[in-house]
Regions:
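Amphipathic alpha-helix face/heptad-repeat signature
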Residues: 9-16, 47, 83-90, 121, ...
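First transmembrane helix
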Residues: 14-26
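Helix-turn-helix
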Residues: 39-41
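Short, helix-capping/interhelical loops that line the mouth of catalytic, cofactor-
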Residues: 1-7, 48-109, 143-155
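Structured surface interface patches that mediate subunit assembly and partner/cofactor docking
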Residues: 1-11, 26-27, 31-37, 60, ...
Length: 268
């Protein structure tokens, strides 16, 4: 499939971040976030604020890698209103920094070798803002559909990057079964091939014949399993924010069980 362009991603970062802040402004700070049960609304706004602050530093300092890849947290502020104000200010700085950067320039990311460019941040942060906008809406009881074009891209990103990323120290051995993820409203399908993963991480952890799946081109053969929904519902579902009843799954029972296990892992 054709990915969105950097201008589209930047527009979505702006739009989804604005909706995120506007919705959270209607919530009490202790409102629970159903999709992140350990979080309150205050935790959610602090999280996305920290994420956008972190990636501002990555883009401003490109291509240097961060000293601490997990350093997204910042000291809490005195009030919820202060946190919301800091988010809006942080967001403005992030967007300005990203807009001034050429997507083709080298920049660190936690993803694979092909994603060590500014373009990765454009795309990843559009989806980060989108999914956390949904979290905010769930907390406020004000859920709206995800934009179809961004959600279609989001299904691909979830399957290809979040679930299907392949580190350079690992190897994927393809199996016989293919799964089709079909978006009924955008006439788009994404296929994954099931297989196994093996390798030894830099920390010395050994993986042997772990079930895995990776995005492939349309194989031109019948899939063993079809997962179908609108782009909005499928993207939300892959991120564990959606309703199972809004996703239709048909095909081989054993393949379904395997895919259910693969998609059950946390990608937050």
């Amino acid at each position: 499939m054709t990915l969105l362009g950097p201008d589209a991603y930047l527009d979505h970062i702006r739009t989804e971040s604005a909706r995120f802040a506007d919705v959270l402004a209607t919530c009490p700070p202790d409102a629970r976030v159903p999709s992140c049960p350990d979080w309150t609304a205050a935790d959610l706004v602090a999280h996305l604020s920290g994420v956008q602050h972190f990636w501002t530093g990555i883009i401003a300092g490109r291509p240097v890698a961060p000293v601490d890849e997990d350093a997204e947290g910042r000291a809490p502020l005195a009030s919820y209103d202060d946190e919301l104000a800091r988010f809006r200010s942080t967001h403005d700085t992030f967007v300005a920094t990203l807009a001034a950067a050429d997507p083709a320039e080298p920049a660190w990311s936690w993803s694979g070798p092909d994603d060590q460019k500014v373009a990765f941040t454009y795309r990843r942060q559009a989806h980060e803002a989108l999914i956390h906008r949904l979290d905010a809406e769930l907390a406020a009881g004000q859920v709206t559909p995800l934009p179809a074009a961004l959600a279609t891209d989001g299904v691909h990103e979830a399957l290809d990057v979040m679930y299907g990323g392949l580190p350079d120290w690992g190897r994927f051995t393809p199996g016989e079964h293919v799964v089709e993820y079909r978006m009924t409203d955008t006439a788009t399908s994404i296929w994954t091939r099931l297989g196994t993963f093996a390798g030894t991480s830099p920390e010395g952890k050994v993986y042997a014949d772990e079930p895995d799946q990776h995005v492939v081109a349309d194989p031109g053969t019948a899939p063993a399993l079809v997962v179908a929904a609108t782009a909005s519902d499928l993207d939300a579902w892959l991120w564990h924010r959606g309703d199972d009843a809004r996703v239709a799954i048909s095909g081989d029972d054993a393949v379904r069980a395997l895919v259910t296990g693969l998609l059950g892992q946390s990608i937050d």
